[in-house]
Regions:
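Residues lining hydrophobic/aromatic ligand-binding pockets adjacent to catalytic sites
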Residues: 1-171
Length: 171
């Protein structure tokens, strides 16, 4: 099954990636299409999930709606091979990794990312790249690897998170 986690299931540049067209194409190939953009999308409507006008993934992860989406993914993984679909090419620049997969691995789900060139990257390797991105990959006397990884996730989340165009949207 393809699980679309885009907040808006439409492409400005490639109409074949619009929800209806994609759903029909996948159905012809016996692949189920599921839209979870409301539950797991990067642009959340819950105003309490914003800090200074930007989505805060640590707050999103605590919402009932997001937890429902994660549970649907866990349940779906029992029945199907799932592929999460979004718009970013590199897993570490997408909320798929920084928000969704981070929470799925806590539930014991094995994550493999398909890279732009078709190669497969284990989630652990994505996390290593994330640590390197912020120069947190070297051992530290004062912090565990998990603490450094948490910092890398937080910093990347801040970097890539959706920012409300109009702060009035959040009032």
């Amino acid at each position: 099954a393809i699980v679309d986690v885009r907040s808006s299931p439409y492409s400005q540049y490639k109409s074949e990636f619009n929800k209806e067209h994609l759903k029909d194409s996948l159905k012809k190939n016996n692949i189920t299409y599921v839209f979870l953009g409301e539950e797991c999308g990067a642009r959340v409507s819950d105003k309490s999930c914003y800090t200074n006008g930007k989505v805060d993934y640590s707050l999103v992860a605590k919402t009932d709606l997001f937890k429902t989406g994660i549970q649907r993914l866990i349940n779906g993984a029992d029945k199907y091979s799932l592929a999460l679909m979004c718009a970013e090419k590199d897993p570490i620049t997408c909320h798929r990794t920084i928000l969704i997969c981070r929470n799925l691995i806590k539930e014991g789900i094995i994550i493999k990312h398909v890279l732009e060139n078709g190669d497969i990257e284990l989630h652990e390797d994505s996390e290593k790249r994330l640590l390197k991105l912020f120069k947190l990959h070297h051992p530290d006397l004062f912090r565990t690897e998990q603490e450094r990884l948490n910092e890398a996730y937080a910093r990347q989340g801040e970097k890539i998170a959706y920012e409300a165009e109009d702060q009035k949207e959040l009032i």
